[in-house]
Amino acid sequence: MKLTKLLTYLKNVPSYAGQEDPDITSIEMDSREVKTGSLFVCIKGYTVDGHDYARQAAEKGAAAIVAEREVDADVPVIIIRHTKRALAVLSDAFYGQPTKQLRLIGITGTNGKTSTSHMVEEIFRKAGSRTGLIGTMYTKIHDETFEAKNTTPESVTLQKTFRKMVDQGVDTAVMEVSSHALHMGRVHGCDYDIAAFTNLTQDHLDYHETMEEYKHAKSLLFSQLGGSFNHETPKWAVLNADDPASAYFAQVTSAHLLTYGIQNDADVMAENIKMAPKGTTFDLVTPKGSAQVTIPLVGLFNVYNVLTAAAIAIAADIPFATITEGIEGLKGVRGRFELVDAGQDFPVIVDYAHTPDSLENVLNTCRGLTEGKLFVVVGCGGDRDKTKRPKMAKIAVDLADEPVFTADNPRSENPLAILNDMEEGVKGAYYHSIVNREQAIFFAIANAKKGDVVLIAGKGHETYQQIGGQTFDFDDAEVAKRAILELK
């Protein structure tokens, strides 16, 4: 695509009057990826500023540079105000606006995004769709998976992925949309058909600073959804009637609304919920019909996830029989209330719970399965929201019999300092503090017996531990299996 043609998609940029009008062969934000003909977009990040690498990009063959200020480079430089947003728009245009050729479903919220997105994908596959998935665990194009670096990739990677999906015949893409991605403009230019909200509880306050700012970031998914009446296919906002933030999201969107819930009246509801150690049965009540469904998942949070997925499917006009069939065929997601079975006579559960709300929910669910003592191994991430540390500790102490505090990706922080922050919330309480995560897991499993439950919280599907700028292999489920086998 010619540079002048590409720049027409940036409506707030002065018309490009350079003598050169090169063919753009790729769009890059990392100077190391630049090749002959690339358009290099300078992005100022947390630790690195792309403007400092403009000359390097030009020397590697960049045809032009988009920047927020003057840079030292012997190629055309286009100055604009917001390069992050520009990167999203330019990437969308360069790859042929692929989301306009997909049914795009975005799911945002503090907890439940990963499980819900997998449920949605399963229902749509049952309906005959060829699906794509973008999320915390991986990116998936039909049956092929790729490692994910962020919950929501950078905009240029995102649009490139959508292009691959379209080229490989995908018709429906489901993606987790993080508050960071919304605030940074990574999804600017994505043409969503359905946007869904799971819940809003404390997380990422190291980045957003206040819950109001966090809520506003989430609301951007709904405010940019567009008007329902300007499209052949209506746009839908799917909202949790039991979460107070939904009222705000309903105000900022002009899309059609579809609600779900358990406590408050909603379009899609779960009634007569019955939980057992290995599954949950409830009545699914929707505008398309009602049916009793059984899922091999436990916990009220999983019922909410199913309701979100069902509401999304209804918004997409999937037949009710297909929705219930998809729900009945659901499987657990790795690291989400994952049962570890190595022949022991007590449940060991690995879960991604890393926020106060998610930890409380999963501990309450575990309590329902516990006849004896409830053990929880829990830590808090380094270089992240410090205010949730004492709250997480208090929840662990209040809801578990044997809380074990430990390290969970301390990153650049001293793990002992993180444990001290946690302990500030539980002075005088009973708990164990074992900084080495492997030793903490071994301790909990060594002391558990029949009738007890061991919950290992925080890392879920992650297979690494980040300590002091280094990344080490670490898998909670694998460590738990090893502990069970060695301690038999």
Curated annotation (Swiss-Prot):
It comes from the Bacteria. Keywords: ATP-binding, Cell cycle, Cell division, Cell shape, Cell wall biogenesis/degradation, Cytoplasm, Ligase, Magnesium, Nucleotide-binding, Peptidoglycan synthesis. Coiled coil: none annotated. A motif (Meso-diaminopimelate recognition motif) lies at residues 408-411. UDP-N-acetyl-alpha-D-muramoyl-L-alanyl-D-glutamate binds at residues 31, 150-152, 178, 186. One of its GO terms (molecular function) is UDP-N-acetylmuramoylalanyl-D-glutamate-2,6-diaminopimelate ligase activity. Its main location: cytoplasm. InterPro entries: Mur-like_cat_sf (IPR036565), Mur_ligase_C (IPR004101), Mur_ligase_C_dom_sf (IPR036615), Mur_ligase_cen (IPR013221), Mur_ligase_N (IPR000713), MurE/MurF_N (IPR035911), UDP-N-AcMur-Glu-dNH2Pim_ligase (IPR005761). GO terms for cellular component: cytoplasm. One of its GO terms (biological process) is cell division. The modification N6-carboxylysine is found at residue 218. The keyword Cell division applies. It is an enzyme of class 6 (ligase). Its EC number is 6.3.2.13. Its cofactor is Mg(2+). HAMAP family: MurE. Catalyzes the addition of meso-diaminopimelic acid to the nucleotide precursor UDP-N-acetylmuramoyl-L-alanyl-D-glutamate (UMAG) in the biosynthesis of bacterial cell-wall peptidoglycan. This is UDP-N-acetylmuramoyl-L-alanyl-D-glutamate--2,6-diaminopimelate ligase. It comes from Bacillus licheniformis (strain ATCC 14580 / DSM 13 / JCM 2505 / CCUG 7422 / NBRC 12200 / NCIMB 9375 / NCTC 10341 / NRRL NRS-1264 / Gibson 46). The gene is murE.
